[in-house]
Amino acid sequence: MSTTDTIVAQATPPGRGGVGILRVSGRAAATVAQAVLGKLPKPRYADYLPFKDVDGSTLDQGIALYFPGPNSFTGEDVLELQGHGGPVILDLLLKRILALPGLRIARPGEFSERAFLNDKLDLAQAEAIADLIDASSEQAARSAVNSLQGAFSVRIHQLVEALTHLRIYVEAAIDFPDEEIDFLSDGKIEGQLNGVMADLEQVRTEARQGSLLREGMKVVIAGRPNAGKSSLLNALAGREAAIVTDIAGTTRDVLREHIHIDGMPLHIIDTAGLREASDEVERIGIERAWHEIEQADRVLFMVDGTTTDATEPAAIWPEFMARLPATLPITVVRNKADITGETLGLTEVNGHSLIRLSARTGEGIDLLRNHLKQSMGFTSNTEGGFLARRRHLQALETAAQHLAQGHEQLVSAYAGELLAEELRLAQQSLSEITGEFSSDDLLGRIFSSFCIGK
């Protein structure tokens, strides 16, 4: 669709509400104002006016705001009509506007997309709008605001600027090889490169924290029937989310709970007990359990402490460990410490974490929560932090790889041309985060996930 069309959409959630807002952006915004309001409101002043139908009858009355471009959210002429939040009224007003020539319904995220295309926002800031709307905790919301205000973008621009300066220095060394000073081997370029790499690593650390705030951690509780998996889910959730009985195989399907640990979203999944299925329903539940296990960030291997003294996962259940993906982190949870009398606590056993607790009494649950937070490297101190998406982490990782390869070319062979190319590729990867270098396909995928009115 053309970006020169004038677009309109409801900017408030669908359904009944005290206020409903329609947003118009584009060249015909002033025409819409004249047709619906009978006048063009004074720019950036709230005007209380009737909203007129084509025959002059009043559809609604409310506040009109007019923002001439380029001093608007999208950089275009923008008109906002704030009326009553009834769906019928808003639909009538929307139809009235769409009947005017040159108007069409906005695509999801098109207002933010136009703001990006008109240099009102960079891509990271535009994404922060959607992240702010979707924030599930206070920390996530504050970090999204920081990103919207440019905290993440500033860090990326600083890295890009440092790489630009370094590239100029390297290119000069390549173009003037006859100079008395060998810029490639005198240590100055390596020192600057090491500085950029250190700064990038710091940004990656902060971005991982931002990603955890946004994406959270997926934890799957797995084990044999009657090990206490559902009791652990209830203890972590702080409510009776799952049915708990003494009958083995009570849980037949996947149960999901979403909680927060100091602002980090935790997606807890309780699964059917793993064993030879006794019927088709249980077989399907066990298949779903393994599907969730394979996609987890961490598995809580639930063990009934009254049935074994073993603490090594392979000794407890070798078949289970053999099927687990080799890189999947697990924590062995020895349950029923209130019965066995085991000392509550967390230890390390041959590279695996082992925690002793009682899901029934809740003893040791806080220790498990802290363990999950620390295992992901999450810190609750997000002052000045920013949110990050998976694509941001991938771009930062790619940039780090190019810088590492460039460093290798420099110290092993003083290969200026190869170093310059790696610096260029690293800079390109970083520029994808803010949208200075992005494909149309990437932009389409990002903005299509936004709300219609954004």
UniProtKB/Swiss-Prot annotation:
Annotated SUPFAM superfamilies: P-loop containing nucleoside triphosphate hydrolases (SSF52540), TrmE connector domain (SSF116878)
Task: Extract one GO BP annotation from the record.
Answer: tRNA wobble uridine modification
- What are the protein's GO molecular function terms? GTP binding; GTPase activity; metal ion binding
* Main EC class the enzyme belongs to: hydrolase
Keyword annotations for this protein, in alphabetical order, are: Cytoplasm, GTP-binding, Hydrolase, Magnesium, Metal-binding, Nucleotide-binding, Potassium, tRNA processing
Q: How is the cofactor bound?
A: Binds 1 potassium ion per subunit.
Entry cofactors = K(+)
Q: What is its main location?
A: cytoplasm
InterPro entries, alphabetically?
G_TrmE (IPR031168), GTP-bd (IPR006073), GTP-bd_TrmE_N (IPR018948), GTPase_MnmE (IPR004520), MnmE_dom2 (IPR027368), MnmE_helical (IPR025867), P-loop_NTPase (IPR027417), Small_GTP-bd (IPR005225)
Q: EC number(s) per UniProt?
A: 3.6.-.-
Q: Which residues bind K(+)?
A: N226, T245, I247, T250
HAMAP family cross-referenced by the UniProt entry: GTPase_MnmE
The record's subunit annotation is:
Homodimer. Heterotetramer of two MnmE and two MnmG subunits.
This chain belongs to the protein called: tRNA modification GTPase MnmE
Q: Which organism is it from?
A: Yersinia enterocolitica serotype O:8 / biotype 1B (strain NCTC 13174 / 8081)
Q: Which gene encodes it?
A: mnmE
